[in-house]
């Protein structure tokens, strides 16, 4: 049980996909303009990454390895992720049309989010079992969502702040992201492995 908790905490805080592995930067910068959109994108991505991680494990161990076609791993994982994203899109369209409109083009783009493919590939490369794969996927997604929501809240505050003209827009967003990354570096000594 402790092993699973350590995996979750280290994936969320210490090895954060956005701030440490630099995966998922496109939605991180693109959807973080409004807090409401960031929360919706975080929830959708959490669902997709967790389900994609579990599905990729099953695809790897029950189809690719037994058929000796592991060289098709990336293509197979992209197809699995596309199916999961389409399912998520249908659920969001039915349950929350407002959120569906707010997310706009970013919802189908979850398919090409490198963090989603990255969690599937890294989980296989780190030789996680099925439970660890689900926890790793959820932890990576929770870390992504945490950083996305915090960054969106800061960007909303920056709109009202008196930022010098040369730093407005993307410039101050990049500086803020860098400061967030430095803050998360403080968690590095939290877990000794």
Curated annotation (Swiss-Prot):
Gene Ontology annotations of biological process type: electron transport chain
Protein name: Ion-translocating oxidoreductase complex subunit A
Stored NCBIfam families: PRK05151.1 (NF003481), rnfA (TIGR01943)
Any single GO CC term annotated in Swiss-Prot or TrEMBL for this entry: plasma membrane
Statement: the UniProt record of this protein carries the keyword Cell inner membrane: yes
Annotated family: Belongs to the NqrDE/RnfAE family.
Biological role stated in the UniProt entry: Part of a membrane-bound complex that couples electron transfer with translocation of ions across the membrane.
Assembly behavior: The complex is composed of six subunits: RnfA, RnfB, RnfC, RnfD, RnfE and RnfG.
Coarse class of the protein's main subcellular location: membrane
Bilayer topology: Multi-pass membrane protein
Transmembrane segments: 5-25, 39-59, 63-83, 102-122, 134-154, 171-191
Keyword NADP: no
PANTHER family: INTEGRAL MEMBRANE PROTEIN OF SOXR-REDUCING COMPLEX (PTHR30335), ION-TRANSLOCATING OXIDOREDUCTASE COMPLEX SUBUNIT A (PTHR30335:SF0)
EC number(s) stated in the UniProt entry for this protein: 7.-.-.-
Annotated compartments: Cell inner membrane
Highest taxon of the lineage: Bacteria
Keywords, in A-Z order: Cell inner membrane, Cell membrane, Electron transport, Membrane, Translocase, Transmembrane, Transmembrane helix, Transport
């Amino acid at each position: 049980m402790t092993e699973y908790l350590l995996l979750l905490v280290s994936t969320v805080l210490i090895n954060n996909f956005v701030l440490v592995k630099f995966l998922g930067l496109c939605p991180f910068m693109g959807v973080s303009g409004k807090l409401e959109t960031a929360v919706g994108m975080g929830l959708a991505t959490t669902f997709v990454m967790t389900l994609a991680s579990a599905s990729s494990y099953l695809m790897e161990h029950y189809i690719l390895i037994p058929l000796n076609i592991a060289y098709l791993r990336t293509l197979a994982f992209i197809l699995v992720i596309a199916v999961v994203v389409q399912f998520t899109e249908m659920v969001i369209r039915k349950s929350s049309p407002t959120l569906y409109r707010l997310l706009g083009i970013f919802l189908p783009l979850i398919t090409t989010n490198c963090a989603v493919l990255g969690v599937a590939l890294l989980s296989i490369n780190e030789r996680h079992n099925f439970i660890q794969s689900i926890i790793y996927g959820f932890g990576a997604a929770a870390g992504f969502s945490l950083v996305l929501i915090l960054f969106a809240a800061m960007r909303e505050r920056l709109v009202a702040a008196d930022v010098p003209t040369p730093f407005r827009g993307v410039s101050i967003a990049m500086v803020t992201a860098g400061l967030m990354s430095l803050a998360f570096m403080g968690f590095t000594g939290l877990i000794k492995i």
